[in-house]
Regions:
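Composition-driven recognition of glycine/serine/threonine/acidic- and proline-rich low-complexity segments
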Residues: 2-214
Length: 214
């Protein structure tokens, strides 16, 4: 699915855009159930993590109190064969997890088991023709979160949270984010966001908070 041309069309079709992003890798049914909601209906702490016009990398690091690392799960094949877009499925991980914000009290002897936990799931589609070659190369290298790359590149950019979603994860999500398909992930929330570079829409993102499942 190509990048939407205007903010209005993106807003009107946010759910379709999310479905298209997910289906770049698997049927939506295996991912879970996704429902568009109003941002005022998102409970804490999800609201502060999602309902903003900023990079999720920054939000996650502030929330968990530690820098996050990137894991590229999968890269979608370039169907057009022209390498004009780059789509990948990712996880953000942190050695520190803010369980308390989710109402969980971690015991000291549990800390080693929680090292490098998944804090965010995401899918991103990038129009690579609209970014400097060195930025694209760094993104495709897969070693640094996207938000950090764009910040360090000092590009004129606008992050826009277009629509938020309630997510009821399926077994795939549990296995990927918690390491066990038998361990249910609680109801969580995500967002569809866009990033414009020099007023041109360049990036689409589906970003889902991974809550504590203790």
């Amino acid at each position: 699915m190509s990048m939407a041309d205007t903010n209005t069309s993106i807003n009107d079709n946010a759910a379709d855009c999310v479905q298209a992003l997910i289906e770049s890798f698997r049927p939506v049914e295996t991912f879970g159930t996704i429902r568009a909601i109003d941002s005022k209906d998102i409970p804490a702490p999800f609201h502060s993590l999602l309902a903003h016009h900023s990079h999720m990398t920054v939000a996650m690091e502030a929330f968990h109190g530690h820098s996050v690392s990137l894991e590229v799960v999968s890269v979608a094949p370039d169907e057009a064969g022209e390498r004009t877009s780059y789509t990948r499925e990712i996880l953000l991980r942190s050695p520190v997890f803010n369980d308390k914000a989710f109402g969980i009290s971690s015991q000291p002897d549990e800390i080693p088991k929680k090292m490098n936990r998944v804090v965010q799931y995401g899918i991103v589609r990038i129009n690579t023709n609209c970014l400097p070659q060195e930025v694209v190369a760094r993104i495709e290298d897969g070693g640094t979160p996207l938000g950090r790359i764009l910040i360090e590149a000092d590009l004129h950019r606008e992050v826009r949270c277009v629509r938020v979603f309630e997510v009821m994860p399926g077994p795939y999500f549990g296995e990927l984010c918690l390491g066990s398909e038998n361990k249910a992930v609680p109801r969580t929330f995500g967002r569809f966001a866009t990033i414009s570079i020099s007023e041109q829409p360049v990036i689409e993102l589906f970003e889902v908070v991974v809550p504590s499942a203790e």
